[in-house]
């Protein structure tokens, strides 16, 4: 009698393998054979679950987003809106090996989005989700009187997005990556310049 296969478990194994490999090696260094081997299965088994590398990339992106999204939702629960915003922005930094891996994954996603409509759609959705999250936090701070009534919420959110992207590029591509402390200082200075939020004391 054929062994019963738990399709959900096997699919998760493939997505976890793809996510792990892309974080380490980038998209160009990942093959269907490599993903299958990392997951402990054959390439033939993999093609039963995804039809192409682009489909695998899209699915792996959603897999990757789960933990990131959960951590950011938790940070949003901070009662102080500005500190919630600071916490969310800190989480987005390429400040440790795991987060640098996430950014390596996302940069590969950017590159692939130029050539693939499905990947491009997911990239746009991720940015839309990110913009909404930051706007929501800045609006909360504005509604609670923590920042000036003249602050343009959307413009401030977009400037924060641009800063985070720029920091990540410097970390991964400049050859002179800013330290975690420097990355956080840049966030603190942005909050002071754009929102009038005083920089927190060290520690």
What are these language model-derived features?
Residues 87-94, 131-132, 136-140, 163, ...:
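C-terminal peripheral helix-coil segments that are non-catalytic and often amphipathic
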Residues 1-9, 199-203:
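N-terminal intrinsically disordered/low-complexity leader segments
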Residues 75, 90-97, 104-115, 189-194:
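Helix-loop "lid/cap" segments that line or gate small-molecule binding pockets
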Residues 98-107, 117-144, 155, 185:
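Amphipathic alpha-helical packing segments from all-alpha helical-bundle domains
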Residues 59, 73-103, 153-160, 184, ...:
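Hydrophobic alpha-helical connector segments
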Residues 13, 17-59:
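Helix-turn-helix
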Residues 62-68:
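Short, basic, alpha-helical segments at the C-terminal edge of helix-turn-helix-like DNA-binding modules
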